[in-house]
């Protein structure tokens, strides 16, 4: 074999070795990616199962309140569901659960047909209290039901279609509104800002009303209207309530470096059951307390 032939053979061997090295490296890289993908998928499945466990716990709190002697005919902040955010360690992960009465928010569905002057005025006062530009959700186009009436809002996110609300405004407004069909504002759970949007009230009176609220809530809207703090003030009973049917569970789950937030809307039914109305994933919340 000549020197030229030996050189060609050596180059061929080097090329084959390089090719084999590239193939093996690619196989190892793909294997690592598959392992990472499998690990991430497994973590997501575990997070989802942990979130559902938290949702089941939230349902149990509402079920326990439903089965009490008075049930949830009166919904107030002294009940099990309102005990505040709860954190648990389970199966190597952590869950934070927060239950909220959606009846404590302004019900956007009361604005749908544009003829509800009390709700419209209250909404405008709420916007002013929050420092937001006035706007009218009734101007949004809505599909009609079989009865020819506008269907309820699917979600508060429909307000994105309003030109008066930018991203910052929507973030500001979102915690104060909900779409709860024909639900009224629950006087037993509503914060001062919601009460201050009622006729003839301001933040000073509203804060005093929150402080004076009975631990087990008002027995009726009339009992709220007749309290001494409202003497000489005319608050319309329309659209007000002392009970709620719709609640929201916000479930934050952590497993190692992985995070998940599940938001579940719940309905307490007259037959004593708690129904899951819908679930949605949201951006993970604040870190867990140490």
Regions from the language model: what does each represent?
Residues 2-290:
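Compositionally biased linear targeting/interaction segments
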């Amino acid at each position: 074999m000549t020197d030229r032939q030996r050189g060609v053979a050596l180059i061929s061997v080097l090329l084959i070795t390089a090719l084999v090295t590239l193939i093996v490296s690619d196989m190892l890289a793909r294997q690592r990616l598959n392992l990472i993908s499998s690990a991430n998928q497994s973590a997501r499945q575990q997070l989802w199962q942990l979130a559902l466990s938290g949702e089941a716990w939230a349902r149990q709190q509402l079920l326990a309140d439903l089965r009490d002697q008075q049930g949830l005919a009166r919904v107030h902040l002294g009940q099990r569901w309102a005990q505040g955010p709860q954190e648990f360690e389970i199966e190597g992960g952590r869950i934070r659960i927060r239950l909220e009465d959606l009846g404590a928010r302004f019900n956007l569905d009361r604005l749908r047909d544009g003829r509800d002057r009390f709700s419209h005025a209250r909404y405008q006062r709420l916007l002013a209290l929050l420092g937001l530009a006035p706007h009218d959700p009734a101007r949004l186009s809505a599909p009609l039901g079989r009865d020819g009436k506008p269907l309820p809002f699917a979600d508060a996110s429909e307000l994105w279609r309003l030109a008066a609300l930018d991203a910052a405004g929507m973030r500001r407004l979102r915690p104060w509104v909900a779409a709860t069909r024909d639900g009224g504002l629950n006087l037993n759970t509503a914060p001062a800002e919601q009460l201050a949007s009622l006729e003839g009230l301001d933040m000073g009176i509203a804060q005093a009303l929150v402080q004076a609220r009975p631990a087990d809530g008002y027995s009726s809207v009339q009992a709220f209207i007749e309290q001494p703090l409202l003497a000489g003030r005319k608050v319309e009973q329309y659209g007000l309530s002392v009970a709620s049917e719709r609640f929201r569970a916000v479930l934050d789950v952590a497993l190692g470096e992985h995070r998940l937030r599940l938001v579940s809307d719940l309905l307490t039914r007259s037959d004593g059951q708690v129904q899951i109305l819908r679930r949605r994933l949201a951006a993970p919340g604040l870190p867990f307390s140490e």
